[in-house]
Structure formats: structure tokens, C-alpha cells
Amino acid sequence: MQTELTFEQLENFSRKWRENPDKLVFQASIMKNGIKAATENPTSKVSIQPVFSHEVATDKVSNQQQSGRCWMFAALNTFRHKLNGTLGLKDFELSQNYTNFWDKLEKANYFLENIIETASEDEDSRLVSWLLDTPQQDGGQWDMLVSIIEKYGVVPKSAMPETFQSGKSADLNHLLNERLRTDAVILRKAFTEKKDTAGLKEEMLAEIYQLLVMTLGEPPKVFDFEYRNKDNEFKQELQITPKDFYERYVDMDLKNYIPLINAPTKDKPFNQAFTVDYLGNIVNGTPIKYLNVEMDVLKKAATDQIKDGETVWFGCDVGQLSEKTTGIMDTDIFLLNQTFGFKTAMTKAERLDYKHSMLTHAMVLTGVNVANGEVNRWKVENSWGEKIGNNGYFVASDAWMDEFTFQVVVHKKYLSKELIEAFNQEPIALKPWDPMGSLAL
């Protein structure tokens, strides 16, 4: 039987508050400045310095603006760092709008196919409700970007630059999702009436293509690649295709890269491969697949890759214990327990199980600091522009990484034979709403 909150209890709560006058100082500061500013720990800011024993040379940060394309920016940033070093470019970027266009069109097709597949289920079934919650969005996972690149390649930012809607995606997402839900109504009715759903879907996608062209521009089939390197030498290649550009200039075999996750919940054993039902963007594309490993294994692989001069795509819960102004992510950055007098002591597994934490954002690890043989902090390249953090870069303490990092993508050469074999086994399929199916925004 549930019990209501009584006035007697409220009086008791108020009395306990008045018995602690020292908290009036905290109250005044918090009410004027907010929780984070009032509880910021200066010791943490001093100890987390942006200096690293091992660091990959990078250029200025990119800016995803008001969009949820961090996973795309992070992956393309790992590619451009390699390309910039090889070709001697400065502040060169690959087109995030190009991959965004194909991602949205493919997600539309993926959604409509899933609507047709589930057309016999009730509208209020958990699966259909989950599909309709977000027909498509900006967010994604590493394997989704792999699917796009393998099918469409990449282009320089100059070949397909940003538009208003690529950087401020809310209106486009609203309109596209409204259209997709309308199409879902039509397709489900057509299925019930035994009409041609495939033909209807093709007509729908043709109109969605037009919507995307009008808001993002039409992707180039060929383009001219012309640039000056850091030595001011002019280089030129005419009429190259996006796939040829990737193979010739980026030249990374993405099949050699393995997504590692750290999900220490009871239902996910370590050294086991996982996938997520109904998660993806391209029908018959690269499936979402991870290998769940202990955090020490994940961090060692990332450290080794950085030491060898290659950056690392990683996914985390960026909003947890993170200070944007200085770009510090540390478990001690805010004195919350000391200020409020109670502890929030959930484990990483409990935060996943009880919906308090999950992968929300993707960035790039570009440096690591080793002191006395132990890693104590990491350099992080964000994609929020140069006005956030330290010219766009953040520093994460190793303790923060333990608690709030959920995924890295590393070359398989940094993993043992046993781990590679574990990844290659048949994955366990997770439900679509599992926290490890969350998308980086």
C-alpha cells in the first residue's frame, strides 16, 4: 500500500534543515550561481593539467553546431588526422554534411523497412512504439559510419559544405520524422489491405530524397580535389569519386577496427560479442557489433594505439561530472557530496541498470599521460567548436574514464588472439531499448 507525504513529515524536514545553519552559506551561493559553479573543486582544476606524455598531433577542432552528429565528426576526425599528416594539410576537414545526407536517407529506408516488417503487430506493442518514438535522428554508432563509408565513400568539406539545416538540425528532424510517421500509417494500412508496400516505399523515399536535397544539397558523384599543403605546394586531382577518394587518400581498412565496450552489468559477460536488434542505418550494411571487455583491457588498447600515433574514437556519458568552460571531466570536479551532505554511490553497472547513465556522446582520444607507469589523464578532442573547453579540447581523469566511458574503437592488432576470436563469435542480440543501444549525439 502506498503512503502519502504528510504535513508532519514536512515539518520534520524543515526542522532538520534549520538545525544546520552552516548550509545557509551554500544555499546563498547555489541560488545565485547554480549547482556546478558553486560546488566546483579548485583542487581538481589544478591537478588535471592539459599536458601529456604521449600525444598525437592534431589541428583545430571541428564544430557540429546545434546537431547530434558527434559520432560522425569523431570518426571523420580520426580519418582527417591521418590524412592531414600524410598530405601535409592544415585544418583540412572531411564533409560531415555528405555523410549526414546519406545517413538520413538510409535511416529513412531502414525505418520504413522495419515498419513493413512489424506491420502485423499492434500499434501499441513495445517494438512498434519504440520504432515510432524516433523514426530517425542525428545520433549514431561507429558501425553506422562504417556502413556509410563502405557504400558512399567520403568527400572534402569543400565538395559538400555545411548548410543551415545541417548545423541546426531540429527543424529538419521534426519535418522528416513527421513525414516518416505519416508513411508508417500508410504502409501499415497497405499491409492490412494486402497492397504493394515496396512500390509505396520507393515513392516515399523519392520524396524524402528531394527533402534532403533541398535542405542539405545533393551529394557530388565526382569532384575535383585541389589543395596546397603546408609547404604551399599546389596539388590537384580532377573528377575523383567519393569512394576512390577514401581508398586513395584515407586508406584505412575499417574491417580491421573493433568496437570495445565496457558494460559491467550481470546480463553482459566479459569477452562476449553483442549486437542490438533494430539498430542501424543501412539495410544489409555493417551490423552493430561490440566486444564487452573489462575496463583495463579497453584502456590499454586505447593507450597503445595513441602511443603508436593514431587517435581513438570513443563514446562516453559526457554530461556526467563534466565542466565545459575549462574542459575538465573528473569524478572530483564538483564537491556535491560535501555540499549537500549525502552520497550518490551507484556503481557503473547500477547506473546502466537504473537508467542514470549510458553512452551519449562520441569524441576522439588524442593523448594520454603516463606517470610512474600508470595512466592518470587523457586528452580529448571534442566537436563543439573552439569556445568550449581548452580551445575545444577536454581533459579526462583516468577515474572519470573508468566510470563514464563505454566504448572505444581500436585496431585489432592491439588485442590478443583470444579477444579477436571472441569478437568473431556469433553475438548475443540485445533488445532495442538496451542501454548499450543508445546513440551518440
Curated annotation (Swiss-Prot):
Annotated SUPFAM superfamilies: Cysteine proteinases
E.C. code: 3.4.22.40
Catalytic class of the enzyme: hydrolase
InterPro entries for the chain: Papain-like_cys_pep_sf, Pept_cys_AS, Pept_his_AS, Peptidase_C1B
A biological-process GO annotation: homocysteine catabolic process
Catalytic reactions of this protein: Inactivates bleomycin B2 (a cytotoxic glycometallopeptide) by hydrolysis of a carboxyamide bond of beta-aminoalanine, but also shows general aminopeptidase activity. The specificity varies somewhat with source, but amino acid arylamides of Met, Leu and Ala are preferred
Disulfide bonds listed in the record: none
Annotated GO CC locations: cytoplasm
Pfam families registered for this protein in UniProt: Peptidase_C1_2
GO MF, any single term: cysteine-type endopeptidase activity
Record protein name field: Aminopeptidase C
Organism: Listeria monocytogenes serovar 1/2a (strain ATCC BAA-679 / EGD-e)
Name of the gene this protein is made from: pepC
